[in-house]
Amino acid sequence: MKGRNQKIGGGGFHHVAMRVKDFDASVLFYTDVLGFKKTIAWGDGDKRAIMLDTGDGSCLEVFAGGSSELKPEGAFIHIALCTDNCDAALDRVKAAGMEVTMEPTDILIQSSPPTPVRIAFFKGPDGEVVEFFQNK
């Protein structure tokens, strides 16, 4: 089976999780603006959480209860979302009032062989850094 990791018996990410200050605003942004679909939700108040399907079965898990004093755990830098049209995806983000930190840019990843991609970055509703990633 293509893409199957024989060492752990699977492959790919199931989900990436983040804790946010404004749960409702974050869920609204990822569902209404980016088109993610709610799969399961649980908890109440600052214990709320939800899984949002990004479109291919992998999910963004959003937890309530974040604060400005909350220190990030681990070393994640950003989350990258696959798109077929980086420019159109970023237009949706701009229309929603999000801060764009890098306009769509063509780059050549210096791999062997070199890999051409188009990328853009923005800040989500809770300040998280999100990348749109388009294979060319």
Residue ranges and their predicted role:
Residues 1-24, 76-83, 133-136:
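N-terminal beta-strand motif that seeds the catalytic metal site of vicinal oxygen chelate
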Residues 37-73, 123-125, 129-134:
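Conserved short beta-strand elements that form part of the metal-binding/catalytic scaffold
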Residues 31-33, 92-97:
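Short amphipathic alpha-helices in soluble, non-transmembrane regions
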Residues 11, 18-60, 88:
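Core segments of cupin and vicinal oxygen chelate
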Residues 12, 48, 75, 118:
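Beta-rich catalytic cores
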Residues 71-75, 101-102:
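A short, polar/proline- and glycine-enriched secondary-structure boundary/capping micro-motif
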